Structures are given as C-alpha cells and as structure tokens.
C-alpha cells in the first residue's frame, strides 16, 4: 500500500498525495467524513496521473466513499467555460485511471447563471490516446447541477450540463476527439449504478470513438443501470434553458456491448 497519511485535512490534500503515488501493493480506500462539505478547485477535483494510473489494477484498486451519517458534499466552484470550450468546468473527474469506485458522494452546483454553471458533475476523460478510463464504478451518488446550462457543445462534448459525462478526449482539450492507439486507449467496462441525478441537461452521457470493423478501438462493455431494478439510476428534471438544443436522460454514442437498463 502506498505511504499515504492516515487522515487528511481535506479531500483535495488527499488527492494531491494520491496522484503522486508510484506503486501500490493492495487496495486503497479514502473515506470522507460524514457531513463534510468541500468546494472543488477550478475545473474540478482530479483523480488520475501518469504514476497513479500505472499503479492501479484489479488488485490495486481505489475506492472513494463516505462515512456513515450525513451526506458528504462536493460543491462546484465558479465556472468560466461553456460546453464548447476546450477546458470545461466540472466538480470531479477521473482522468485515465482504472479500477476506481466513487460511492455515495453528493455533488452540487449552486451556480445559477452561465458560464458559472458546471458542464459536468462527474467527468470521465482519457489521459491520452493510449490511456483510457476502464473498470470504474460510479454508484450511490447524488448529483444536482443546473439545467439552465443548455448551451451548444463541440466535438465529443455535448450540449449543456451533464450529471455523469464520459468523453473521448482529454480534459484540457475536451472538444477534440482522440483516436485510440489500442484497446487501452478506450473508455471501457465502466459501470454507473444506483445514482440519483437531477436538474441537468443530460443525466448520463457516454460518447466514444467511431471505430471501424472489427471495432477493437471502440468503447466496450459500459453499463448504465446494471442487471436489476436495485442498481438502476434515477434521472429527473432534465433538459433546460428553454432553447432548442437537445436534452435526454441518457445519451449513448459509439459504444459496443453496452447495457442500459433501469
């Protein structure tokens, strides 16, 4: 196990040390204090780095959860970007990391005007064309954004605010689609279960690479809702701004062997 501290003064401080990890010998769990609230830094909390991503595996997993009791809330900062910006605003993002579980957190965007509103609650991005995000689980989270953000997107970034947004791009060039260099560069085998998502333009979006046959460079095996009603997601009050731009509870594009069920 990496030499992390037993306790940290903030989630941000814990992530700084976590992203500096170079080796792991077993699973790591970060348990956030019940009732705690922390504001995200500009562009959001980030999980993923070149060293951490190389250390994570099916046995060296990362779980971020909360202690029993009152909700643990991550709040949005003040955004500056629109959905068609290269570097969108969000609360929490996974960047190329694998085997990460986000369990039971509450994410809230209290901004009420654009462009201060967030483009995503939880974003899942690639670190590079060779390092996609794989085998991650987002479950039991409550995500509330602002559906007034219905502005036009660009490239793989869709219109407006998205509760959970998985994108074929890196977070600092989010509107530029990547061509995966191999299967490791896809966003594959990720699961989204038992989340409550509200007041967004889209609830969940998974947007992959338009692969050609035999589709080895396409996203594969992503799962929205699991196999029973207990693991379904609740998505309400989506679509907004009163504009003609599209909105949906779930939007899926360029995916293979995906599951969508509630």
Model-derived regions, located:
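Extracellular beta-strand/beta-solenoid scaffold signature
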Residues: 44-47, 78-93, 114-129, 151-187, ...
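Acidic Gly/Asp/Thr-rich repetitive segments characteristic of extracellular carbohydrate-active
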Residues: 1-31, 44-46
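Surface-exposed acidic, glycine-flexible loop patches that form ligand/cofactor-binding
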Residues: 17-25, 52-55, 129, 183
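Residue-level recognition of the N-termini of beta-strands and the immediately preceding loop/turn
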Residues: 26-30, 60-62, 133-136, 160-162, ...
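Right-handed parallel beta-helix/beta-spiral solenoid domain characteristic of secreted/periplasmic
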Residues: 38-119, 145-159, 231-240
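Feature marks extracellular polysaccharide-active and adherence modules
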Residues: 33, 65-67, 95, 103, ...
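Acidic helix-start/capping segments at beta-turn-to-alpha-helix junctions
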Residues: 31-39
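Hydrophobic or amphipathic alpha-helical targeting/insertion segments
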Residues: 100-101, 127-137
């Amino acid at each position: 196990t990496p030499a992390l501290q037993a306790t940290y003064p903030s989630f941000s401080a814990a992530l700084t040390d976590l992203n500096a990890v170079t080796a792991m010998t077993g699973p790591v769990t970060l348990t956030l204090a019940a009732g705690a609230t922390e504001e995200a830094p500009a562009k959001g909390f980030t999980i993923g780095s070149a060293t951490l991503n190389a250390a994570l595996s099916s046995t060296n997993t990362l779980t971020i959860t909360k202690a029993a009791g009152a909700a643990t809330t991550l709040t949005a900062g003040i955004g500056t970007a629109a959905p068609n910006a290269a570097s969108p605003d969000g609360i929490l993002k996974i960047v190329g990391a694998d085997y990460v579980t986000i369990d039971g957190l509450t994410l809230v965007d209290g901004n009420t005007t654009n462009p201060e509103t967030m483009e995503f609650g939880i974003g899942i991005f690639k670190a590079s064309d060779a390092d996609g995000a794989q085998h991650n689980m987002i479950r039991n989270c409550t995500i509330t954004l602002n559906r007034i953000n219905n502005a036009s997107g660009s490239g793989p970034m869709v219109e407006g605010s998205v509760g959970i947004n998985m994108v074929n791009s890196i977070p600092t060039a989010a509107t530029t689609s990547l061509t995966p260099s191999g299967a490791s560069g896809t966003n594959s085998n990720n699961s989204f279960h038992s989340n409550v998502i509200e007041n967004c333009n889209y609830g969940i979006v998974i947007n992959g690479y338009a692969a050609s046959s035999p589709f080895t460079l396409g996203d594969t095996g992503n799962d929205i809702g699991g196999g029973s009603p207990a693991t379904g997601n609740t998505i309400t009050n989506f679509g907004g701004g009163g504009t003609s731009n599209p909105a949906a509870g779930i939007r899926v594009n360029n995916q293979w062997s995906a599951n969508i069920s509630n």
